[in-house]
Amino acid sequence: MKNNAIVFDFSNLCQRCLHLTQVAAESENPSWDLMKFMIFDKMFEFVLEAGADLDGDCDVLLALDSHSGYWRRDIYPPYKADRAAKRSNSKIDYARAFQEFSELAGAIKEHLPWKVIEVQGCEADDIIYTVSKVYPGTVMIHSSDSDYIQLVDDRVRLFRANDGNWFRFPYRYKAGKGKTVALSKEEFLEVAIMTGQSGKDNVYNILTDTDWSGLRKPGFGIVAALKLLDSDDIKAELEARGCFGNYLRNKKLIDMTELPEEEFAKISEALNSCDTANDVHGFLEYYSWPSMMSGQKREEVLFGIAGVCGLEGPSLLEEPENETKSDEWEKFDDFGDFTLEA
């Protein structure tokens, strides 16, 4: 394990690229290969830039969501329960999309010196939180998910992929139907716990019980949350309203420091025992993306990945005997500069 870490919220990046216009995910013939190229290219360019000053003392990690459920759903059944219905009503072939995401992650694990981490019962959030705790140096998180704001400090930085900037306070954001400005991560987290994450993870606000089945949830938005934060005794106020239990429920679901010890131990073990590969040539040959097979770009990829991860050696840097180029990729010879749109 190196001193520093660059960690990607892999699902977050994949979903953003899936919905780009160039991929045409809702069409009858989506550009799956183009999508995978864009995912990898975004990661590579970020690794190259973010790792430039780390002197090779850096691990690059992909944090994946578990394919076997989440511990949060075990304690709160509504957790993300509305996503399946949303996907079933979409024109996107999500089964195929997830297959393509998994294939890319598998190819990276097989060929590159990047750690691909998936832990049964855990989400990318749990993995990234653990990374922020076990790596002693600089940790750089790549995600547009605002949940990671609670981890930001002098050592942990968040690159917001949706606007291409490093996160900093004050932070203007939406919570429920309202908008506010957070001046600290503590304030941001408390508001999130109280108002819930109904549009994101289906976490109800603190006035809504877990077994709620009505047509309209009780309201509790930003104004109510900020007013409660000004209270001299927040716990007493919550108990008086009969919602302290729901507050603790939401804190368990949203506050990353609430990760169960056994899950933290599982992730830590995965981080320590994860094997990486040393075959960038093999990765490039596997996909044969034209813009990365050209001499200058190919050299940049080979030496860039080696430099950031502190690697060198013939298996990484020697040119292969034969270069191949897929004919079906001729139409993508000039990808241009794609951007991840908000």
Where are these regions (language model features)?
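Domain-level signal for Mg2+-assisted phosphodiester chemistry and nucleotide/NA-binding surfaces
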Residues: M1-G106
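Extended two-metal-dependent nuclease catalytic cores across DNA- and RNA-processing enzymes
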Residues: N3, D57, A85-Q296, L302, ...
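Acidic, proline-/serine-/threonine-rich low-complexity intrinsically disordered repeat tracts
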Residues: N322-T324
